């Protein structure tokens, strides 16, 4: 059975390491803030100028002036700091962010990423995605395995405008977890009840299964 969105976010939260500085992309990745493992102290950063994002607020905690880059209301943890976009992007471009968890519309088995526009459709802009994939030490994609119409999102080549080439290190979907390697995709983990036959049918490229040592 496929993971729910919360289960996907919880799986992605397992990528977090103690003391890391992490950027969560707009959409599904923002749910990761609600699933940070006990004992793991991370600093979540947002391009609009906040370091120290906490979980999403309850009804009595909402502050309309405290938002993330996707304009969602958030909370701030103790010790959080606020700054301008120039400082925020200096953190990103300067290589000071350890991990970015980003959504995607398409990704290839070589780690190419398309996540900012569909030609002919209105978009607000590319946001910080291009800066993130160029400046962050590790990039994890968190997305549904296939599109709403059933078409593949993991492909040999993206046909949407690229955000970055060879930038993705790991792909987490509602069905599985893959590592992007020089030799292609390696299946690390599958959701409970999801078999290889289903995965191969819903993945637009070949992959190998990680060997257990």
UniProtKB/Swiss-Prot annotation:
Supply one GO BP term: lipopolysaccharide biosynthetic process
Q: Which InterPro entries match?
A: 3-oxoacid_CoA-transf_B, CoA_trans_fam_I, CoA_transf_AS, NagB/RpiA_transferase-like
Can the keyword rRNA processing be found in this entry's annotation?
A: no
**Keyword annotations from UniProtKB, A to Z:** Lipopolysaccharide biosynthesis, Transferase
Assembly: Heterodimer of a subunit A and a subunit B.
Enzyme Commission code(s) on record: 2.8.3.5
Chemical reaction(s) catalysed: a 3-oxo acid + succinyl-CoA = a 3-oxoacyl-CoA + succinate
Q: Which SUPFAM superfamilies match?
A: NagB/RpiA/CoA transferase-like
Active-site annotation: 47
Q: Which organism is it from?
A: Xanthomonas campestris pv. campestris (strain ATCC 33913 / DSM 3586 / NCPPB 528 / LMG 568 / P 25)
From the record, give the transmembrane residue ranges.
none
Task: Give this protein's Gene Ontology molecular function annotations.
Answer: CoA-transferase activity; succinyl-CoA:3-oxo-acid CoA-transferase activity
Enzyme class comes to: transferase
What's the superkingdom here? Bacteria
Q: Pathway, per UniProt?
A: Bacterial outer membrane biogenesis; lipopolysaccharide biosynthesis
Entry similarity comment = Belongs to the 3-oxoacid CoA-transferase subunit B family.
Query: Which protein, by its recorded name, is this?
Result: Succinyl-CoA:3-ketoacid coenzyme A transferase subunit B
């Amino acid at each position: 059975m496929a993971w729910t969105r919360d289960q996907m976010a919880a799986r992605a939260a397992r990528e977090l390491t103690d003391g890391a500085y992490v950027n969560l992309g707009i959409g599904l990745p923002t749910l990761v803030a609600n699933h940070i493992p006990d004992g793991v102290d991370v600093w979540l950063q947002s391009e609009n100028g906040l370091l120290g994002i906490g979980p999403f607020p309850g009804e009595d905690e909402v502050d309309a002036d405290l938002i993330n880059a996707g304009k969602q209301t958030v909370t701030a943890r103790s010790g959080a700091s606020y700054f301008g976009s120039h400082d925020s992007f200096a953190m990103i471009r300067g290589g000071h962010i350890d991990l970015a968890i980003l959504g995607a519309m398409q990704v290839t088995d070589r780690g190419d990423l398309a996540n900012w526009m569909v030609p002919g459709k209105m978009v607000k802009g590319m946001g910080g995605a291009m800066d993130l994939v160029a400046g962050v030490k590790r990039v994890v994609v968190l997305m549904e395995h296939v599109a709403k119409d059933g078409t593949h999102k993991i492909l040999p080549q993206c046909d949407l405008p690229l955000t970055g080439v060879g930038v993705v290190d790991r792909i987490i979907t509602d069905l599985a977890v893959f590592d992007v390697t020089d030799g292609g995709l390696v299946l690390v983990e599958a959701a409970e009840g999801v078999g290889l036959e289903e995965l191969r049918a819903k993945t637009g490229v070949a992959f190998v299964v990680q060997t257990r040592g």
